[in-house]
């Protein structure tokens, strides 16, 4: 698909972590264009029901349900991080995309591989930048577009 003769591609961000004693570490993050795979593997938890005078209603205040919702959110973020970083060709030791029980270990694994907390946070920022448009990026793109129009 094209918009105004421009082919649409996924957003990509690159993070280069310098290493003095070896090659620099390059992380490439791309936008996750669909969460269908995640939803198929990890459907949203359903609240247990309670019987009221008005009938059967979901009990969203149930402590067990709230824990499941929190875990679901953690897995969702982990999935986005892992899928976004696929172009980096990371050879995970414990994390596998096929096993959602391993997903939340991604940050622990980056740290145990030797990244500092700050570097791991930069990886997260890179992933978030690839998956979101902030106002600064939109303004920069708009200004560039308008400058091109003014020069015509």
For each of these PLM feature ranges, what is it?
Residues 23-152:
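Short, surface-exposed, charged amphipathic helix/loop patches that serve as local interaction elements
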């Amino acid at each position: 698909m094209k918009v105004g003769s421009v082919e649409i591609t996924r957003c990509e961000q690159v993070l280069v972590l310098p290493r003095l004693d070896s090659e620099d570490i390059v992380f490439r993050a791309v936008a996750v264009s669909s969460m269908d795979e995640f939803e198929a593997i990890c459907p949203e938890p359903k609240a247990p029901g309670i019987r009221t005078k008005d009938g059967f209603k979901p009990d969203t205040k149930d402590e067990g349900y709230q824990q499941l919702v929190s875990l679901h959110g953690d897995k969702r973020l982990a999935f986005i991080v892992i899928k976004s970083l696929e172009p980096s060709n990371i050879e995970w030791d414990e994390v596998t995309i096929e096993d959602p029980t391993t997903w939340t270990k991604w940050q622990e694994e980056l740290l145990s591989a030797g990244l500092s907390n700050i570097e791991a946070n930069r990886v997260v920022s890179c992933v978030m930048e690839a998956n979101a448009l902030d106002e600064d990026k939109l303004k920069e793109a708009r200004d560039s577009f308008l400058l091109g129009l003014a020069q015509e």
